[in-house]
Design a protein with these regions (language model features):
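Single-stranded nucleic-acid-binding OB-fold domains
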Residues: 13-23
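N-terminal helical hairpins
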Residues: 18-20, 33-103
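Intrinsically disordered, low-complexity boundary segments flanking structured domains
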Residues: 25-26, 99
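Long, polar/Ser/Thr-enriched low-complexity segments
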Residues: 26-29, 53
Length: 103
């Protein structure tokens, strides 16, 4: 079984602010140097985003729900990655995002 290195990154793009001032959240998956990124259909106020933790800093309900969603998505990505490794299937960032139903 070949070991595939995978990294998951959640980030915002300040250059693509929505009309309400919130920044869309993106997910980038990198596997052995290949990367693909996609919007996760969630947004966050600029002042509440923590780039280091890749989470919302807020303590309100919407921030807590957003952080739970991000964590669940990350866990699901790693689960599918592990399943594909066990099956020795071709693993690309695009395939992984399709399996998670983001793309």
């Amino acid at each position: 079984m070949k070991q595939e290195s995978m990294k998951v990154l959640f980030f915002i793009r300040k250059s693509r602010l929505k009309k309400n001032g919130e920044a869309p959240i993106f997910l980038r998956v990198t596997i052995n140097g290949q990367l693909d990124e996609v919007r996760i259909q969630r947004s966050v106020p600029l002042k509440l985003w923590d780039n280091v933790k890749e989470r919302s800093k807020g303590k309100d309900r919407s921030s807590t729900e957003l952080n739970s969603y991000i964590e669940a998505l990350k866990v699901r990505l790693y689960q599918i990655h592990k399943e594909l490794l066990c099956r020795e299937a071709l693993i690309t960032p695009k395939n992984l995002l399709i399996k998670v139903s983001i793309r």
